[in-house]
Swiss-Prot record:
Name this protein carries in UniProt: Phosphoglycerate kinase
GO molecular function: ADP binding; ATP binding; phosphoglycerate kinase activity
InterPro entries, per the entry: Phosphoglycerate_kinase, Phosphoglycerate_kinase_CS, Phosphoglycerate_kinase_N, Phosphoglycerate_kinase_sf
Residues the record lists as binding ATP: K216, G304, E335, G364, G365, D366, S367
Taxonomic lineage: Bacteria, Bacillati, Actinomycetota, Actinomycetes, Mycobacteriales
CDD domains for this protein: Phosphoglycerate_kinase
UniProtKB keywords: ATP-binding, Cytoplasm, Glycolysis, Kinase, Nucleotide-binding, Transferase
Source organism, top-level taxon: Bacteria
Length: 407
């Protein structure tokens, strides 16, 4: 696909040009403004640094959390601006609004190499509006900040891979108004995901966890036809176990999906692999005493919170021979130490396979958080994606609006 890259833009020369960048800076921030996982901020640095070094006047737009379309101090990008400045090693200005008087004044005062971060784009209800005309109005206001009126030299760089599956003003509509380019991050992500959907090296193993089958159904259906083995763990494995006629106690169960899982097992039984043992507890709590039971022996009064050691052993054997691996979703409640061994064991198996030459991708979201929280080496994997939802939708075979518009 003919998407222009950041290198294409830099080779045209950007000194003195206004460049609007959509970054993904949606990181976890606590009430005191502390960022527990700066992964997405770090991932946004290469594009911003390259543009700033080349003398562009950089205006960055991003969101944090899910504010209700109006300013909310809880979702201010102030702590993000500070952290971004530290990672970049240069000052990042924060506008007090999205496209208001402060943003305009600051944008007009930018000199070559300066970086201005606009306040949370989702403070403006037009960003996520379903009304095309409303979104376009906001997009035009954003374009104005980089002097992008007719005949100007302004440009748009899409670098927020975590939002490319959303048809939003700062992701989609601005790209219809300005010459557009994929930033380093988006460029890398597209190439990596293409390797997972096109003929990669075999055997191809997929590991899916997380709580709900309904969230992953389309990706299971799409990848079950492409993968040699598809490992199911996390909360969603109980709906599959129930589909086999097993009792799952008080474990998470999507009743409405049992029949769907039964059909998937009928159609792809040779590809799908379920846990054979489960770590159970009486309640969903870090201090709830844990015990391991066979998958067909879950007591009525207990819930499964992790896969057991025998499952880890079997999944490790599958993964050790794989040449291409995609992992999305934890195997258990890794936030509680007593229920983290399944996720850690499977992650270590993927790292082991990668060390032997496999191409491995961690599909964003909770899996990436688990890697960091469990103290696993991030460079043990070929690639850790920054976009959970976006990478899943890509692997489902869906068109991503934010990518489509760049083509």
């Amino acid at each position: 696909m003919g998407i222009k890259s950041l290198d294409d833009l830099l080779s045209e020369g950007v000194t003195g040009r206004g460049v609007l960048v959509r970054s993904d800076l949606n990181v976890p921030v606590d009430d005191d403004g502390n960022i527990s996982d700066p992964g997405r901020i770090i991932a946004s640095v290469p594009t911003l640094k390259a543009l700033s070094d080349a003398g562009a006047k950089v205006v960055v737009t991003a969101h944090l959390g899910r504010p209700k379309g109006e300013p909310d101090p809880k979702f201010s990008l102030a702590p993000v601006a500070k952290a971004l400045g530290e990672k970049l090693g240069r000052h990042v200005q924060l506008a007090g609004d999205v496209v208001g008087t402060d943003a305009l004044a600051r944008a007009e005062g930018l000199t070559d190499g300066d970086i201005l971060l606009l306040e949370n784009i989702r403070f403006d209800p037009r960003e996520t509006s379903k009304d095309d005309a409303e979104r376009l109005k906001l997009a035009k206001a954003l374009v104005e900040l980089v002097g992008g009126e007719d005949g100007s030299s302004a440009a748009f760089v899409s670098d927020g891979f975590g939002v490319v599956h959303r048809k939003q003003a700062s992701v989609y509509d601005v790209a219809t108004l300005l010459p557009h380019y994929a930033g380093t991050l988006v460029d890398t992500e597209i190439k990596v995901l293409a390797q997972l959907t096109e003929a990669g090296e075999r055997p191809y193993a997929v590991v899916l966890g997380g709580s709900k089958v309904s969230d992953k159904l389309a990706v299971i259906e799409n990848l079950a036809t492409k993968a040699d083995s598809l490992v199911i763990g996390g909360g969603m494995c109980f709906t599959f176990l129930a589909a086999q006629g097993l009792s799952v106690g008080s474990s998470l169960l999507e009743e409405s999906m049992v029949e769907t899982c039964r059909k998937l097992l009928d159609d792809y039984g040779d590809v799908l692999h379920l846990p054979v043992d489960i770590v159970v507890a009486e309640k969903f709590a870090a201090d709830s005493p844990a015990e391991t039971v066979a998958a067909d022996r879950i007591p009525d009064d207990k819930m499964g919170l992790d896969i057991g050691p025998e499952s880890v052993k079997r999944f490790t054997a599958l993964l050790s021979n794989a040449k291409t691996i995609f992992w999305n979703g934890p195997m258990g409640v890794f936030e509680f130490p007593a229920f983290a061994a399944g996720t850690k064991g499977v992650a270590e198996a993927i790292i082991g396979a990668t060390g032997k030459g496999a191409f491995s991708v961690v599909g964003g979201g909770d899996s990436a958080a688990a890697v960091r929280q469990l103290g696993l080496p991030e460079d043990g994997f070929s690639h850790i994606s920054t976009g959970g939802g976006a990478s899943l939708e890509y692997l489902e075979g869906k068109e991503l609006p934010g990518i489509q518009v760049l083509e």
